[in-house]
Amino acid sequence: MPHSPLLLIKEKQMYQLRIIAGPCQHESLSQSSHIAEKCKAICDKHGVEYIFKASFDKANRSSLGNKRGVGLANTLNDFKLIKEVHGVKTLTDVHDIDQIEMITTYFNECVDVLQIPAFLCRQTDLVQAACATDKIVNIKKGQFLAPWDMKGILSKCDEAKELWITERGTSFGYNNLVVDFTGIDYMLNNFRVPVVFDATHSVQKPGGLGGSSGGNRDYVPGLCRAASALGVTNFFLEVHPDPDNAPSDGPNMLRLDDFESVVADIATINAVV
């Protein structure tokens, strides 16, 4: 990186408006392709850069019997087709160094952004392995971390081609998260990296349904408007055509039909902030 991510800046960060969106987990080529096509068209309409996201393995599940995904090879082969057909960049999360090596060895052209999950954000070997690739790296801030604690994580990332950090809510008692906008403001003004706001995981209720996580997608639009007003220019949204029947994170995923209204609000507010 030309500058250490620990350098502090006072001026407003000026990054292109960007939205990362897609299903929680990749279920099929037809579904993911449909989501990517619709999301890209909406983002293009509103002058927003679009990146498609999906997980090949939801390793962090509340219960053993919950569906985890269709696997790395199946997912990333479909990513290649989605990239070719729709002309989009792609993001997926990794959970161990072997997965990073598999991606860079056999599926390097299929993935543009490697994401470090929130619960793994302090795993030094994993973070450094991702940063040693030619990929953009997005690190999700753990629900258990203070915003300024990201400084220690960023100190591990000097080799990264490009680095982002994501706010996805903070633990607030049992089975609950809260969004602390003062923390987002701190990261925007103290770290020389783009700060992404994950609005859909921020409304999650971890383990809130007993055997799975709950959530309330109704709060997503308002949180996006607030983040945009604060100056956030990078957003992460999980979207699905039928979230109530999705295999994971259904309660907090945005309905695909509601995606455009959220994008329009973000773009409108961003234009005047």
Predicted region positions:
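Glycine-rich, proline-tolerant flexible connector loops at the mouths of alpha/beta enzymes
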Residues: P23-L29, I51-L72, V239-D249
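Alpha-helix-loop-beta-strand connector modules within alpha/beta enzyme cores
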Residues: C39, K67-T90, A130, D185-V195, ...
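Short, well-ordered coil/turn segments that N-cap beta-strands
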Residues: Y15-R18, H46-Y50, H86-T90, C110-D112, ...
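Structured C-terminal cap/extension of enzyme domains
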Residues: A226-V273
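Catalytic beta/alpha-barrel core
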Residues: V70-G71, V88-Q99, V111-D125, I136-P147, ...
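N-terminal amphipathic alpha-helix/helix-capping segment at the start of soluble metabolic enzymes
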Residues: P2-I20, V273
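Catalytic alpha/beta core domains of metabolic enzymes, predominantly
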Residues: D134-V239
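Glycine-rich anion/phosphate-binding loops
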Residues: H26-K38, V70-N74, G214-G222
